[in-house]
C-alpha cells in the first residue's frame, strides 16, 4: 500500500495518531502561545489552517473544537476525512480553496462546502486557476486571513 500524508493527520485512518496530533495542538501549542506571548487566544480571533492532508486535520479540529477555533482555513483538502453524516453544532466559519488544475482536491473542497452550508455554517469556497502546491496556497492565505479577521 502506498503511504500518504493523510495517514498522519486524518481521524479516518489512525485515531490514535490523530489524537496525538489533536492533543499537541489543543494543549501544547496553546500553552506555548500563552507562555511565549502572554495571550490566551479566543475562538473569534483564532483559526486552524491546513493544506492538502493537513487541511483534513484542520477541518477535523474545527469540527471538534469550535470553542477554540472560530475559523477553519482548508486549502486543497484530501479525501481521507469526509464530512460526517451529522455535523456538530456550532460550526466554525470555514474558508475552502482548491485549484482548477487539481480536480480531485476541488471535488473534496466542494463536498465539504456543500455539507457545511447544508448544516448552516458560514462557508466560502473559492476555486482559482492553480495546482497542488505552495505558491497557490501562499497566494490564498492573505485572503483567508482578511475574510476571517478583517485585516
Where would I find each of the regions flagged by the language model?
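Non-catalytic cap/lid and distal C-terminal segments of serine-dependent acyl enzymes
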Residues: 1-151
Amino acid at each position: 500500500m502506498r503511504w500518504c500524508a493523510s495517514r498522519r493527520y486524518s481521524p479516518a485512518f489512525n485515531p490514535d495518531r490523530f489524537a496525538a496530533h489533536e492533543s499537541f495542538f489543543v494543549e501544547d501549542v496553546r500553552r506555548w502561545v500563552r507562555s511565549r506571548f502572554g495571550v490566551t487566544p479566543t475562538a473569534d480571533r483564532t483559526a486552524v489552517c491546513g493544506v492538502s492532508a493537513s487541511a483534513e486535520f484542520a477541518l477535523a479540529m474545527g469540527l471538534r473544537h469550535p470553542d477554540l477555533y472560530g475559523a477553519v482555513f482548508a486549502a486543497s483538502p484530501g479525501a481521507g476525512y469526509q464530512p460526517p453524516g451529522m455535523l456538530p453544532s456550532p460550526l466554525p466559519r470555514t474558508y475552502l480553496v482548491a485549484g482548477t488544475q487539481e480536480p480531485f482536491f476541488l471535488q473534496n473542497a466542494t463536498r465539504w462546502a456543500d455539507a457545511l452550508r447544508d448544516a448552516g455554517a458560514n462557508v466560502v469556497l473559492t476555486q482559482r486557476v492553480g495546482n497542488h502546491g505552495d505558491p497557490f496556497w501562499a497566494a490564498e492565505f492573505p485572503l483567508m486571513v482578511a475574510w476571517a479577521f478583517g485585516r
